[in-house]
Amino acid sequence: MSIETQHRKKDPVRLYRQLLESAATIAGRDGIAALSLNAVAYEAGVSKGGLLHHFPNKQALIFALFARLLAIMEDAISTLMTADTTSYGRFTRAYLHYLSAPELTDTQESRQLMVLSLAMPDEPVLRKCWRDWMLAHLAQGDELDNSHTGTLVRYAADGIWLSELTEGRTMSAEHRQALVETLYNMTLPT
C-alpha cells in the first residue's frame, strides 16, 4: 500500500464543499431538525473534528448552507436581470421568473431553500441574511421594485413557490401560467 493511499491528502476547500453538500442533502431529505453536526460528519464520511474545523457549531453550518443557497439564487437572478432588456422592474421580474419557474419546484436546491426559509423565524441570523440580501437589491432597484406593486409581485412569487413545495401543485398549469403572466405584466412600464 502506498503512502498516498494510506493518508488522504488534505484539501480543506474540497472538504468544506463536501460538508456543505452533505448538510444540504440532510436538510433537503430530512429537514432542518435532522441537521446535526454528527449527522453531517457521518454523511460526509469525516470525523466530527474535521467538521468542527470548518463549522464550530450548528448555527455556523446552517448559516453557511443558507449563504450557499442564496448565492445560487443570486447567480440565477443576476443572469435573468442581465438578459432583461427592460430596466424598469428588472429585479422584481427576475425574482418572479426565478421563483415561479415550474422546474425549480422539483429541485433539491428548492427543497433545501424551503427548509431553511421555514427555519427563519427561529434563526435570527438567517432572517438577517435574507433581509440584507433583499434590502441590497431594493437599494439598487427602481421605482417599481420599491413600490407596493413590486412588493405584491414578489410576495405572490414567494407564495406560488412555497405553496407548490408544501402542498404540491394545486392549480392547473393554465391557471398557474395565467397568474404568473398577470404578475409579470404588473412589472412592465405602462
Annotate the PLM regions.
Residues 1-14:
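N-terminal intrinsically disordered/low-complexity leader segments
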Residues 18, 26-60, 64:
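Helix-turn-helix
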Residues 21, 85-104, 151, 176-188:
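Amphipathic alpha-helical segments that line or abut small-molecule/effector binding pockets
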Residues 64, 71-112:
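Hydrophobic alpha-helical connector segments
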Residues 95-99, 112-117, 153-160:
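Short alpha-helical scaffolding segments that buttress acidic/His motifs in well-ordered protein cores
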Residues 106-107, 124-190:
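Hydrophobic/aromatic-rich alpha-helical bundle segments in the mid-to-C-terminal region
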